[in-house]
């Protein structure tokens, strides 16, 4: 074994500098943070050759006392803390006392500083960690520090520096983050004698965002905030139209400190998930104010990462705040269209006590997926229904709060609300003698017949009692213009033109419906006339075994059929007529790409998303009744504005928008 050597101070300082000072932008970051901690309100940064030749920081902060000038450049000399306990109560940007010692050991450094209580300041010059002189000087209150010839005495580090253009870009980026974090401070970046960035310290975050980005982005922001006992989350998120293909426009600040956090980024992006298209990343500037004892900032040499005491609670707080803000913005955009006061509903809260429960059964109606039988996606072409006895025997449900549904009634878990339409008259006139059989084949797309609901007191009656709709104001001022290209539905309402993507809209309806069935535990399955046998690889079979309960709860009946072979006997009824093998393998592939620790909710959502393949397609010609039914289904949803993949389900043009297009108005 080699002899153990004690390194001299110069060597240890250079090694430490390698951890703290990676590139010129690291110097700018450390020195500007010192200026902020000193209470500066105006900070000027001058650079030459990307900071490799010169970095100069001028601030109007409190300055450094003459007696402390020399000590400021000693390793681990700081005015921020006295003991290790202070780290967990720290509210300043810096605290380790490493920056000045590290910077001065690998550069030529000159510092001038004066405090308000002195008529003169002090100037110190250090070259390669050695003090060349210390003298009195005249200067303004505050501090000016010049760092030149960075890494001049560390050739190994010098040759790995990037181009001056690249380093200038990195410095601009970190200055922009400071502008966002501190809207009340004026920052001025001068590159090669020319002003590059200028902020005015107005204290308005939106002004800072406009300064850093542009007018378009500043005009497409959504404000959000959430305040809890120990944490406040607030800031701005961008509307979907300003999303980008990279994460460069994302900023996270914890107690005003710019940090990078995968889990905070994930919380925001998950909140955006159903509002953005695939591979698009949202714009956001998010601030997290939290008591210092609940975070640890001493986990990275550059303090660019933090640890939270309770990441789960943090994730939920951020997710909820962002998600509600997005939903609120979209809801406001379509207020006139989705005015649910216009929808006539029957609130059955008073009759909840009259309901009883049934045990869940499986659907016993086999459906041949290869036949030409078609199910009307909106359930309008079924002439006759099975008897009450048959319904109770054949349809598996968990709730026995039964009303005839025919895909036109909806129930809310919290406050049972039944939605009815003009089929009510027909249903009320039916008695069980008419329910002998279904004479017509089921039409295309009724892939999700809802559970039927009967009133407890009428299950033995010869008719089904349904609360009758006396009026429905929703359609009074709504005009269905028709379809464009058999893909987009055109609707006029309240002097506004709505264009609905029929595929995206129906996709969202099916997604929410299937997801709701999974959550409530009564997914209706269909028995396949010919079970589908699939031979899996060992890896695929292991993924299936790991997620077999997910498949079961989603309406799939799957049995092992050999060492790595499975036999699919039932699939969710909502899927209609899928290619069972392809669908199953698609779901398996999605589950494979998820982490094993992903929650079951995320996995169910993935399955529900794939289930949307049975939605109506572009170029499908819809009747007016079908269009109305699709709109009714959308009205029930909490978030009908985007499909499961993040595409918009509709867009709106006001009369003013159209008149501007035709140059009728300015």
Swiss-Prot record:
Q: In its keyword annotation, does this UniProt entry include Cell wall biogenesis/degradation?
A: no
Q: Per its UniProt record, what CDD domains does this chain match?
A: HATPase_MutL-MLH-PMS-like, MutL_Trans
Q: Which UniProt keywords apply?
A: DNA damage, DNA repair
Protein's GO biological process: mismatch repair
Gene3D superfamilies referenced in this protein's UniProt entry, alphabetically: 3.30.230.10, Histidine kinase-like ATPase, C-terminal domain, MutL, C-terminal domain, dimerisation subdomain, MutL, C-terminal domain, regulatory subdomain
HAMAP family this protein is in?
DNA_mis_repair
Q: Which family does it belong to?
A: Belongs to the DNA mismatch repair MutL/HexB family.
Q: What does this protein do?
A: This protein is involved in the repair of mismatches in DNA. It is required for dam-dependent methyl-directed DNA mismatch repair. May act as a 'molecular matchmaker', a protein that promotes the formation of a stable complex between two or more DNA-binding proteins in an ATP-dependent manner without itself being part of a final effector complex.
Q: What protein am I looking at?
A: DNA mismatch repair protein MutL
Q: Which organism is it from?
A: Clostridium botulinum (strain Loch Maree / Type A3)
| Gene expressing this chain | mutL
